[in-house]
Amino acid sequence: MLSFNSIKTILDQSSNLDLSEIKKIYLLGTTGAGKTSLVRNILGTNKYSFPTSTQTKTTIAPTEYIVKKNLPFKTTILLKEKNEVYDSIELLVDEAIKKAWDNSKVNKNNLDDIKYKLEESADGRFRLKQMVREDTLKEKAGDIETKILPLIKEHDDNESLLDNIDVKTIKNNIIKDLFEDIENTFLKLNIDNYKLFDGTPLIIENIHNKEDFILRNKELLKTDFGSLVLLAEYIRIEGQGLLADWLPANLEFVLIDGEGIGHSLSEKRDTLSVRHYDFFDYCNQILLVGKALEPFIAGGQGAIESIYINGYNDKLKLIFSKTDEIKNNDKTGFLRRQLSNLEDALEKQKISFDI
């Protein structure tokens, strides 16, 4: 995984942009809070449903949008290294093998359980099903059940499940086949003059029409099968024409849609993951998005606590999303009561929060 400084160095070398005088904004929020909807409204891309999102799937690769005068449309995607992708696949296969073994201990024979473990990681950050065909996943789940399970079924614990040399051989073949499926899916994306895993940024440019540019990005970065998001480490999308019509035409900014809060249990419980703090340092403002009906609970409240404790409170602004879901006639009063409840909760953590 690339460090934040490495990412910025690569992007600077690729674009040669001077962003020193432009306001930089970091979007933060729990899964389903409405960050992606906010980005769509700022970019004027609602009719294209871009960026794509679902109710339960959160942003994985941080995506940076740059709006600047005289800037042509361009997308730069930094991809993960081959070994990192391979290791992530191996972790999924290991979990699928352990699930097959667990099921065998309670006389449960469920191929779907094994396949589900292959589809994506528990935290949702690595979704193999975005680049591996359904029939391949089912076939490899079957290999685990029919070829590996008989070799490990009698084990008393799962610590040594994968030590058997025959198990290792079959497992490595499964990983190899899954990896090849990823490569084949990538080839079908029709990206000219680019070799996967050669260490260079993937660049989409020379598209002058906003609709064509957005649709090409949507094709590559969608949330379902045929997307390359699985491989993406960081994404930069730039262009003067990205701005929605309702915003001032001379507006310039960098907007970073960060990973959603709540990928890890610790983040849901109390503190923010350290991956956010580089962005806090880099950006001028932190916009924390929360659903109006239940704002800033769980991970959201923990995020506010972490921001205050670590001295970033001067950068923090709160945004209520999905206000159309409020049935109360006095929406302002409703939201103020919600904030008052948040203030009371933070006081218990000895954090002074002014509404």
Residue ranges, per PLM feature:
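N-terminal pre-Walker A segment at the start of P-loop NTPase domains
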Residues: 1-19
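Globular "head" domains of long coiled-coil molecular machines
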Residues: 17-355
